[in-house]
Curated annotation (Swiss-Prot):
Biased composition (Acidic residues): 19-37
Protein name: Transcription activator of gluconeogenesis NCU03938
Cysteine pairings via disulfide bonds: none
Biased composition (Polar residues): 337-351
PROSITE patterns given in the database record: ZN2_CY6_FUNGAL_2
Record carries keyword tRNA-binding: no
GO cellular component: nucleus
Species the sequence originates in: Neurospora crassa (strain ATCC 24698 / 74-OR23-1A / CBS 708.71 / DSM 1257 / FGSC 987)
Localization per record: Nucleus
One Gene Ontology biological process: gluconeogenesis
Positions of region (Disordered): 1-66, 333-405, 532-579, 639-674
Xref: SUPFAM superfamilies: Zn2/Cys6 DNA-binding domain (SSF57701)
Domain PAS residues, every copy: 475-546
Composition-biased stretches (Basic and acidic residues): 52-65
């Protein structure tokens, strides 16, 4: 019967015969009898097509048979017929069968983990054999019967339904071979109220689109699945085996690089020259020159963008201004003029952080003359006067960021810190406060590191000293936050020993307030530590030959003032009335200060990462009135004890009263304790409990036994910059202290 075969049957047999030579991607084996029949029919058909040249037959079950490279995605016709397809569109099989116009990518069954992925993310990676001249569209997940008589120029094949289209690029742009011409999207998207189609996509340019009023009350999504530009990645350059893996990598690049940025106001993206909604040739995300006006404007800041919608643009992310709000993808770079990747221009200013910018930052302008390219709706916005009230509203107030701005440090510091004057004040304090042996020991410790200071400072000029102070303030900016989060009492000092920062725990422990320590309030402390046997024994070991002398006095500048005792007292009184930061030497007793500076000489330039753990005695903050009241209370408490002939004779004074149980206190002692509690940073009830059982009771003779650890942080010039100290009070049951 080979002579009775008609042309139509020959065409069908030719298609079937090729299926015998080419193998299905699923490697479906047929039965033996079917193979024999197919081979007989293919001999006759191949004789007609190849003019007698028969192709070599391979056994389908032969494991050594040559295998053809499978296509990434089979077309719909080849997929339905279980035939091997190619990467080109239309494929060779559809061309032979006359189905070239309807050759579309087939619909694959999604895996479970891909059910939530949009259909656009599951497109195949277009290979090098992709034909851009053919009109190809992306499937939308719906199958329709094929029609061989459909137009070749139609944007949607016969298998898919019509939909409003958003082409990614305008017709004026360079034609791409890696992206289809038109991308279909539904007309309504519940996730994306910002991308509204126009009433007639064939008429006019986008201009100002209409946004429905119910949609204005909802903020737009950060990643809009209906935006075609969100899936526009350079998939060829990523060398991914699957479309979904490349898209996942691109989306991670979106989230990691620009999720914290504000929506860019890009007026240049609205300048379209075609009749479709398209993107300009500077890139899908429009990262050309001069696109940023100001990151945080006082009048049009982040709050006004979230709470109100601009009447000129009909929404925060309207199509008229194309403020799509999508972050910039730094993870997939490309050239500035590339149209295949959402890259950012290297010469365009970009916001680099979110939460540390100054609210009073100046406008970002790319090149001169860029103001003429701005649309008219944004020019009056820049001419509005700035209001100080709105200037404080930044991203911190919306997102709960910290309110402090480190950029103010670099604007406020104009002069270097006078460390020389501070060292002179320290030496004067040591001479007036400590004995001669302790003063000489401290001065020797400081003199041992003086050559290192001089070698590091000799090449520094005024600009370096100002930079040094800015570095100190910037480092203190970070350490203050750590100190406030630390549960232990902590202070931060300069290299001269002046207190620069303190937390509330230290104030609760010692009674020294922050204003007094930082020099904002006058220091009225009268507790100098006294003189006890421990201090004298430690002080006698140091000094000049172990001799304990009196405190030396500095010679007056004017000899006539030296004989007048009243003038000296008046001058010292004026010096005390000037608030100044408290030195570390004023917070500890004499022996602790001497030991501290001995360790300081070892750590200043020798051990850059070293720490010191010691025990010290901190001095409680007591004014002269508190000390007089404590002395009166101690005298009143010792009188009944002496007359009764019982009780302890060596009671210690604690917060204005003897160290006894709370029930044994007299009425004369309670006002003093209440007065101390009223000056505390705690509430009244908590302060009352703290005054009886809390941390303020751990003292003896106005001193606190503490263990402390400290380290030194150096600056860029390798000079000691900040001394960080943490304290922990010691509890001794033998000292009749109450439990904390």
């Amino acid at each position: 019967m080979p002579d009775d075969v008609g042309p139509a049957e020959a065409e069908v047999s030719g298609a079937v015969s090729e299926s015998d030579n080419e193998y299905d991607e699923t490697e479906v084996t047929t039965k033996d009898d079917d193979d024999e029949k197919m081979a007989e029919r293919s001999v006759a058909s191949e004789g007609v097509e190849t003019n007698g040249d028969q192709k070599k037959k391979y056994d389908p079950k032969d494991p050594l048979r040559p295998r053809r490279k499978k296509a990434r995605r089979a077309c719909y016709a080849c997929q339905r017929a279980h035939l091997t397809c190619g990467d080109e569109r239309p494929c060779q099989r559809c061309i032979k069968r006359g189905l070239a116009e309807a050759c579309q990518d087939g619909v694959r069954k999604k895996a479970k983990y891909l059910h939530d992925a949009p259909p656009e993310a599951l497109r195949p990676v277009l290979g090098p054999n992709y034909n851009p001249a053919a009109a190809v569209s992306v499937r939308n997940g719906h199958r329709h019967p094929s029609n061989a008589g459909s137009d070749a120029g139609s944007s949607i094949g016969t298998f898919y339904s019509q939909s409003t289209q958003y082409p990614v690029f305008s017709s004026a742009a360079t034609q791409l071979g890696s992206i289809p011409e038109n991308l279909p999207f539904p007309q309504q998207s519940p996730v994306s109220p910002t991308f509204q189609p126009s009433s007639n996509p064939q008429l006019g340019s986008i201009g100002v689109s209409s946004v429905s009023s119910p949609m204005n009350s909802f903020p737009p999504a950060l990643f809009d699945p209906s935006n075609p530009a969100i899936f526009n990645f350079n998939l060829e350059g990523l060398n991914f085996g699957s479309q979904y893996g490349a898209m996942e990598f691109g989306m991670l690049g979106h989230m990691s690089s620009g999720a914290a940025e504000t929506p860019p106001r890009d007026p240049s993206m609205a300048q379209q020259g075609t009749s479709d909604v398209g993107f300009n040739p500077s890139g899908v995300f429009g990262n050309g020159l001069n696109q940023f006006e100001k990151v945080y404007d006082n009048n049009t800041g982040l709050i006004s963008d979230f709470l109100t919608l601009d009447a000129h643009s009909n929404g925060l992310y309207s199509q008229g201004n194309l403020q799509h709000g999508l972050p910039h993808a730094y993870a997939i770079p490309a050239g500035p003029t590339s149209l295949q990747s959402p890259s950012t221009e290297n010469n365009s200013p970009q916001p680099t952080g979110f939460g540390f910018e100054s609210p009073t930052a100046t406008n970002y302008t790319g090149v001169p003359g860029a103001a003429g390219n701005q649309p008219g709706s944004q020019q009056p916005r820049a001419q509005k006067p700035k209001t100080p009230a709105l200037g404080k509203l930044g991203p911190q107030s919306v997102l709960g960021k910290r309110q402090r701005d480190p950029s103010s440090i670099y604007e406020a510091v104009k002069e270097p810190f006078q460390y020389v004057a501070s060292f002179h004040k320290l030496i004067s304090l040591l001479q007036n406060r400590f004995s001669g042996a302790s003063t000489i020991s401290i001065v020797r410790s400081l003199a041992s590191i003086r050559p290192s200071f001089m070698s590091c400072m000799k090449t520094l000029n005024r600009a370096d000293l100002i930079f040094m102070e800015k570095s100190f303030q910037r480092a203190l900016f970070e350490h203050e936050e750590f100190m406030h989060q630390s549960p232990s009492p902590a202070i931060a000092c300069r290299r001269t020993g002046e207190i620069a920062a303190v937390n509330k725990e230290f104030t609760a422990l010692t009674g020294w307030t922050k204003d007094v320590l930082l020099g904002k309030t006058l220091n009225l402390n009268a507790n100098m530590g006294g003189t006890n046997s421990d201090t004298l024994s430690i002080s006698s070991k140091g000094g000049r030959g172990g001799i304990v002398g009196t405190t030396p006095r500095l010679k007056p500048l004017h000899p006539e003032q030296g004989t007048n005792a009243d003038s000296q007292q008046q001058q010292s009184q004026q010096h005390k009335e000037q608030p100044q930061p408290v030195f570390l030497a004023e917070l500890m007793d004499e022996a602790s200060v001497t030991q501290f500076y001995e360790d300081y000489a070892q750590l200043a330039f020798t051990h850059s990462r070293g720490t010191v753990v010691r025990k010290c005695r901190l001095l409680k903050y007591r004014t002269q009135e508190n000390m007089d009241a404590a002395a009166a209370a101690a005298a009143a408490a010792s009188a009944p004890t002496a007359s009764g002939g019982s009780g302890s004779s060596n009671g210690t004074v604690v917060n204005g009263g003897p160290d006894s149980s709370p029930a044994g206190k007299t009425e004369k002692e309670r006002p003093t304790g209440v007065n101390v509690a009223s000056n505390s940073i705690l509430s009244n009830r908590v302060a009352k409990i703290d005054g009886e059982h809390g941390i303020s009771k751990l003292e003896r003779d106005g001193k606190l036994e503490c263990s402390y650890t400290w380290t030194i942080k150096r600056d860029v010039f390798d000079i000691p910059m900040i001394i960080m100290i943490n304290f922990l009070p010691c509890y001794y049951r033998s000292h009749n202290q109450l439990a904390v």
